[in-house]
UniProtKB/Swiss-Prot annotation:
This is D-erythrose-4-phosphate dehydrogenase. Belongs to the glyceraldehyde-3-phosphate dehydrogenase family. Epd subfamily. It is found in: Cytoplasm. Keywords: Cytoplasm, NAD, Oxidoreductase, Pyridoxine biosynthesis. One of its GO terms (molecular function) is erythrose-4-phosphate dehydrogenase activity. Homotetramer. NAD(+) binds at residues 11-12, 322. The keyword Transcription regulation does not apply. Its EC number is 1.2.1.72. The gene is epd. The lineage of its organism: Bacteria, Pseudomonadati, Pseudomonadota, Gammaproteobacteria, Vibrionales. GO terms for biological process: pyridoxal phosphate biosynthetic process; pyridoxine biosynthetic process. The record marks 186 as: Activates thiol group during catalysis.
Length: 345
């Protein structure tokens, strides 16, 4: 049984805990602690009731020291609640934590990861790209087999790299990619304002529900980290739209082979049924963003939107639940880190 602690119980942290149970991975993963500065009552309430993902199927109760996840048998899992702002003070050694899932979005350097290890954790997985000095960045389904025992401080990438990198991999292996551009059409996030208010990014001073808002993105750097051969070959822009969840990615690539739409789509279908099963999905149903809410795949390609211009310019629309899909990949990567360890976790 892999013992994990969740540091930061916001959107991703809560989804990770919920995914442990909804995916059935509670047979493999035991959450022993959650570190969050918020009060236990609010933590329990937001875990039980979620605007985007609905009511959690497990009953949640709490006291001042524990979140309790109840099973139909009457038994429950007691998860220790911590309220510590300094990593060095976290009792990971006493709790015998194997992997810390750091979902704060604040910490992300090698030094931050090593601080968790000094506190007693064996390994650390960050829920965002983090610094360039980390031991590895994993996009599950693409490069998780590169994990080694000595990789102690690891990044799970971002929701958008988890969405687009598997598709880039499939297209490149099948047709050869020369270059590409991406537009991320991303749901609003909690770093935006409900009504106009101050922010150091002037576009993010504006009300999230009233505008399509361009924001900075380093997605191209995330692609280069996984595929160094694509250095300076991809560019990306991102806009936030007035929805609370689910993201669409508009991918355009120039390839080396002359293809038709069906060639591209069939390549994705084949991958979704084989090498990227449970990571990539494919649909031709006339769906909209809400239909992909709570979808555990990293990427869902809408084949009706695939276009080919002049044989070698390919455009695709790729969906993802930027919260739920990513949370499920955090668990997959954590288990892959366990599998790569020489010392049993």
């Amino acid at each position: 049984m892999l013992k994990v602690a969740i540091n930061g119980f916001g959107r991703i942290g809560r989804n990770v805990l919920r995914a442990v149970y909804e995916s059935g991975k509670h047979q493999q993963i035991k959450v022993v602690a959650v570190n969050e500065l918020a009060q236990p009552e609010a933590m329990a309430h937001l875990l039980q009731y979620d605007t985007s993902h609905g009511r959690f199927g497990k009953k949640i109760s709490h006291d001042q020291e524990h979140l309790n996840v109840h099973h139909e048998s009457g038994e429950y899992d007691a998860i220790r609640i911590l309220h510590l702002s300094e990593i060095e003070l976290l009792p990971w050694r006493d709790l015998e934590v194997d992997i810390v899932l750091d979902c704060t979005g604040v910490y992300g350097s090698k030094a931050d990861g090593l601080a968790h290890i000094e506190a007693g954790a064996k390994k650390v997985l960050f829920s965002h790209p983090g610094a360039n000095d980390l031991d590895n960045t994993i996009i599950y389904g693409v490069n998780h087999e590169t994990l080694k025992d000595e990789h102690r401080v690891v990044s799970n990438g971002s929701c958008t790299t988890n969405c687009i990198v598997p598709i880039i991999k499939v297209l490149d292996e099948a047709f050869g990619i020369e270059s590409g551009t991406i537009t991320t059409i991303h749901s609003s996030m909690n770093d935006q304002q409900v009504i106009d208010a101050y922010h150091n990014d002037l576009r993010r001073t504006r009300a999230a529900s009233q505008s399509i808002i361009p924001v900075d993105t380093k997605l191209h750097k995330g692609i280069e980290r996984i595929f160094p051969k694509f250095s300076n070959k991809f560019e990306a822009i991102s806009v936030r739209v007035p929805t609370v969840n689910v993201t669409a990615m508009d991918l355009s690539v120039t390839i080396n082979t002359n293809v038709k739409v069906n060639d591209v789509n069939q390549t994705i279908v084949n991958a979704s049924q084989c090498t990227l099963r449970n990571i990539v999905d494919y649909t031709e149903s006339p769906l909209v963003s809400i239909d992909f809410n709570h979808d555990p795949h990293s990427a869902i390609v809408d084949g009706t939107q695939t276009r080919v211009s002049n044989g070698q310019l390919v455009k695709m629309l790729v969906w993802c639940d930027n919260e739920w899909g990513f949370a499920n990949r955090m668990l997959d990567t954590a288990l892959a880190m366990k599998a790569s360890s020489q010392v049993e976790l």
